[in-house]
C-alpha cells in the first residue's frame, strides 16, 4: 500500500473513507491546487461494493469539505468508464480525451462555491484569470 502514496499525501491531502462495519470500502482524496481550485484523486470503491452509492458518498463528503474551505471549483481526471458517474454528480467534461497508462481519460470540473457579494476582490481576479487561461487554452488547441 505504501507505493500508492506520494509527497502530496503528507502535506496537502484530505481523505474521505466509507466503511462497511470495520472494513473500508470506498475512499477518495482532496488535493488543493490553488487558493480557489482543488482536485479529487484516487476515488476508489471495492468491486464488491460498486453500485451501492459509496463512491458518491465519498465524492459528496469531499465536495462538502471543499465548499467549507472556500474553494471555488473541483476538478477530476477520470477514466472514461467513470465519466458518466461524475457527470451524474454534476461534473462537466472539458478538454480533449487522452490516453494514460493504456486507458482513455477525461478531465471534468464542477463549480462548488457560487459567487457571493462578500467574496473578496483577490478571489474574483483569480477566477477571471483562471477562466481566461481556460479560454486561451481552448482557443489555441481547437
UniProtKB/Swiss-Prot annotation:
InterPro entries in alphabetical order: Acyl_CoA_acyltransferase, GNAT_dom
Its EC number(s): 2.3.1.-
One Gene Ontology term of the molecular function aspect: acyltransferase activity, transferring groups other than amino-acyl groups
Family named by the database record: Belongs to the acetyltransferase family.
Pfam families found in the cross-reference section: Acetyltransf_10
Enzyme class: transferase
Keyword Transferase appears in the UniProt entry: yes
Protein's UniProt keywords contain Cell inner membrane: no
Name listed for the protein in its UniProt record: Uncharacterized acetyltransferase SPy_1546/M5005_Spy1274
Top-rank taxon, per record: Bacteria
PROSITE patterns the record matches: GNAT (PS51186)
Residue stretches making up the N-acetyltransferase domain: 1-120
Amino acid at each position: 500500500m505504501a507505493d500508492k502514496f506520494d509527497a502530496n499525501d503528507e502535506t496537502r491531502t484530505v481523505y474521505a473513507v466509507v466503511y462497511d462495519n470495520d472494513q473500508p470500502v470506498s475512499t477518495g482524496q482532496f488535493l488543493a491546487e490553488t487558493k480557489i481550485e482543488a482536485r479529487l484523486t484516487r476515488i476508489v470503491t471495492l468491486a464488491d461494493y460498486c453500485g451501492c452509492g459509496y463512491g458518491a458518498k465519498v465524492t459528496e463528503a469531499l465536495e462538502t469539505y471543499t465548499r467549507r474551505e472556500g474553494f471555488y471549483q473541483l476538478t477530476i481526471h477520470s477514466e472514461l468508464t467513470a465519466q458518466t458517474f461524475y457527470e451524474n454528480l454534476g461534473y462537466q467534461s472539458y478538454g480533449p480525451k487522452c490516453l494514460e497508462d493504456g486507458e482513455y481519460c477525461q478531465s471534468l470540473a464542477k463549480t462548488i462555491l457560487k459567487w457571493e457579494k462578500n467574496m473578496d476582490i483577490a478571489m474574483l481576479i483569480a477566477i477571471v484569470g483562471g477562466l481566461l487561461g481556460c479560454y486561451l487554452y481552448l482557443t489555441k488547441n481547437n
